[in-house]
Design a protein with these regions (language model features):
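Asp-based, Mg2+/Mn2+-dependent phosphohydrolase catalytic module
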Residues: 1-5, 15-19, 36-43, 95, ...
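N-terminal helical cap/lid subdomain that shapes the substrate entry/recognition surface
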Residues: 2-110
Length: 239
């Protein structure tokens, strides 16, 4: 039916709940950064974090209409402002800590492993196209056992662009020499995943889950699952 199956991650394969605003998170980040010599109070740290994130995004918009910043660069600036030099490994540690403390739970949806195994058994190519932070997502892929299933993984923070922008989709198609007519995008975002794929000439499957953004009225998906039941996907796209 299709040769290439392209998946979104969060809200599609992975059910996750995070809270990046809770005081406890920023208290602990403030303490840990202080241990490394970058002394902030909580409000100052959050304010600077938001400021540097916005500045980086604005800088990138000069060359890319759908930019994705790498939050590692935000941490670099936060440490540099206090005169502290840190390694990429230390920044990765801080981002891992931020993610773990802010995450309520993370788990696979029912049926994910079954579908991915079936795709591989049939000789299909499987790809990940995710709007995400590499220092969050790559450890989570390993933790959830998903990494071995993918023939290619594209994460927006590594590429500097994100869905629904054409640049991110074009990077996937060109890097792995994929024919859009032989490919399908599976995701839970009616704009980033479905509209983006439609504009690239790809078929798509929209699955509406609890963490999906509001669905657009003019949904361009080839297939649609509105009740969030991932187990329905196999029969729809592997006939």
């Amino acid at each position: 039916m299709y040769k290439n199956y392209v998946f979104d991650m969060y809200g599609t394969l992975v059910d996750i709940r995070t809270n990046e605003w809770k005081s406890y998170l920023w208290d602990k980040m403030t303490e840990m950064m202080g241990f490394y010599g970058a002394v902030y109070d909580r409000k100052e740290l959050k304010k600077k974090y938001d400021l540097y994130s916005a500045q980086l995004e604005q800088e990138m918009k000069q060359s890319e209409p759908h930019p994705e910043i790498d939050l590692a660069k935000v941490y670099e600036r936060l440490f540099a402002e206090k005169g502290v030099e840190v390694s990429p490994q230390t920044i990765a540690f801080f981002m891992n800590m931020f993610r773990v403390v802010s995450t309520k739970f993370i788990r696979l949806y029912d049926g994910v492993t079954d579908l991915l195994e079936e795709l591989k058994n049939r000789g299909k190519k499987v790809y990940l196209l995710s709007n995400a932070q590499s220092n969050f997502t790559r450890p989570e892929l390993r933790y959830l056992g998903l990494e071995p299933y993918f023939d290619g993984i594209l994460i927006s923070s590594e590429e500097g662009c994100k869905k629904p922008g054409k640049t991110f989709y074009q990077t996937l198609l060109q890097r792995y020499q994929l024919d859009p007519k032989e490919s399908i995008m599976i995701g839970n975002d009616s704009v980033s995943d479905i509209q983006g794929a439609y504009e690239m000439g790809m078929d798509s499957l929209y699955i509406h889950t609890e963490i999906s953004p509001e669905c657009v009225e003019d949904l361009k998906s080839t297939y649609t699952i509105m009740d969030g039941d991932f187990t329905k996907i196999k029969s729809m796209i592997l006939a």
